[in-house]
């Protein structure tokens, strides 16, 4: 070779081209980044990182391959005047190790040393073949700063990415109580529907003992009777509101006030026909309005069994009860 000086990089710039031997990566990092390019952000940050960032548990065996191959690289290039072969074992001798690009695990594939080097780079390095597999993580930087987290039982031994523990319940805490599934629609017989309607005409709200007694008498569940009364009260309140609006009243008359906390439920369920017509002029106007089955239905009815089961009673309740039974068990209040 006629110009051996052209193949060797200047002595003042090798630290800028690639890391010094003091920043030689441990064996675990060599195996982790053996298949990746050297222009990754992690590699560039690692090159400019001072030696204090390296973990304390770096094996000293990772520095032995460059010391063994440094004299052979100097003999091949013919530039033995830059240093003695024994000087490659020192940690600060960057010119000697800069001449052996193929022996370094952090060799830049497209760097100046690779372009000017005469020997082609081998695919696998002896240091990579002799390095044992990592014990816990592929990144030994976790061993220092994340020591208390790695010792936790959440992380498996062969995991290279820190997993999210699955035992934390805070992502599910905001959902609240799990919602029940949709209940099946109950199908009531004519006898059950008439008995429920008869009880509803007596009292709009039924107590728990009476509800359980009625459910056992009709062969129904307590929840079915409860849902039926809720849906029935909702329909009755809506029809009462439409009645007042059609008779020239206002919607606020159906809302509870301080003087009358229960305008719709208590007044209609407890008073007779004469008292209701005298006290509520809006209702009397509605009764003298043109005949409407819905208006006639909402009038106060006596609690006698003969009246509730009379053939002249409108069948609006029985026709629309099936539509109410499919609603949810939550009562919607009109406000």
Curated annotation (Swiss-Prot):
One of its GO terms (cellular component) is nucleus. Could have a role in patterning the central nervous system during embryogenesis. Has a key role in regulating the distinct phenotypic features that distinguish two major classes of ventral interneurons, V0 and V1 neurons. Regulates the transcription factor profile, neurotransmitter phenotype, intraspinal migratory path and axonal trajectory of V0 neurons, features that differentiate them from an adjacent set of V1 neurons. The keyword Protease does not apply. Residues 181-240 bind DNA. InterPro entries: H2.0_Homeobox_NeuralPatt (IPR051662), HD (IPR001356), HD_metazoa (IPR020479), Homeobox_CS (IPR017970), Homeodomain-like_sf (IPR009057), HTH_motif (IPR000047). This is Homeobox protein DBX1. One of its GO terms (biological process) is regulation of transcription by RNA polymerase II. The lineage of its organism: Eukaryota, Metazoa, Chordata, Craniata, Vertebrata. Residues 56-102, 240-335 are annotated as: Disordered. The keyword Nucleus applies. GO terms for molecular function: DNA binding; DNA-binding transcription factor activity, RNA polymerase II-specific. It comes from the Eukaryota. Keywords: Developmental protein, DNA-binding, Homeobox, Nucleus. Its main location: nucleus. Residues 83-95, 299-317 have a biased composition (Low complexity). It is found in: Nucleus. Residues 318-335 have a biased composition (Acidic residues).
């Amino acid at each position: 070779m006629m110009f051996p000086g052209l193949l060797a990089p200047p002595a003042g710039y090798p630290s800028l081209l690639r890391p010094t031997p003091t920043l030689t990566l441990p064996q675990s990092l060599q195996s982790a980044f053996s298949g990746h390019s050297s222009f990754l952000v992690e590699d560039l940050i690692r090159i400019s990182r001072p030696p204090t960032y390296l973990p304390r548990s770096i094996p000293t065996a990772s520095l032995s391959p460059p010391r063994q191959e440094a004299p052979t690289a100097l003999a091949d290039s013919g530039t033995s005047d830059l240093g003695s072969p024994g000087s490659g074992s020192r940690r600060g001798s960057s010119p000697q190790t800069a001449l052996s690009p193929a022996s370094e695990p952090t060799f830049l594939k497209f760097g100046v040393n690779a372009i000017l080097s005469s020997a082609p780079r081998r695919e696998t390095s002896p240091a990579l073949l002799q390095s044992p597999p990592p014990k816990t993580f592929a990144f030994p930087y976790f061993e220092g700063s994340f020591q208390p987290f790695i010792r936790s039982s959440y992380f498996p031994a062969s995991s290279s990415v820190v997993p999210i523990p699955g035992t934390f319940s805070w992502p599910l805490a905001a959902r609240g109580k799990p919602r029940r599934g949709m209940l099946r629609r109950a199908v009531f017989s004519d006898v059950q529907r008439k008995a429920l309607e008869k009880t509803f005409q007596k009292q709009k709200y039924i107590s728990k003992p009476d509800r359980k007694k009625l459910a056992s008498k009709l062969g129904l569940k307590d929840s079915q009777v409860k849902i039926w009364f809720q849906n029935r009260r909702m329909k009755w309140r809506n029809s009462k509101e439409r009645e007042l609006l059609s008779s020239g009243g206002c919607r606020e008359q159906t809302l509870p006030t301080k003087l009358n906390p229960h305008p719709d439920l208590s007044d209609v369920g407890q008073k007779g026909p004469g008292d209701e017509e005298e006290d509520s002029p809006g209702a009397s106007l509605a009764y003298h309005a043109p005949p409407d089955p819905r208006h006639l239905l909402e009038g106060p009815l006596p609690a006698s069994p003969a009246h509730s089961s009379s053939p002249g009673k409108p069948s609006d309740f029985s026709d629309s009860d099936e539509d109410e039974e499919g609603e949810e068990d939550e009562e919607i209040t009109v406000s």
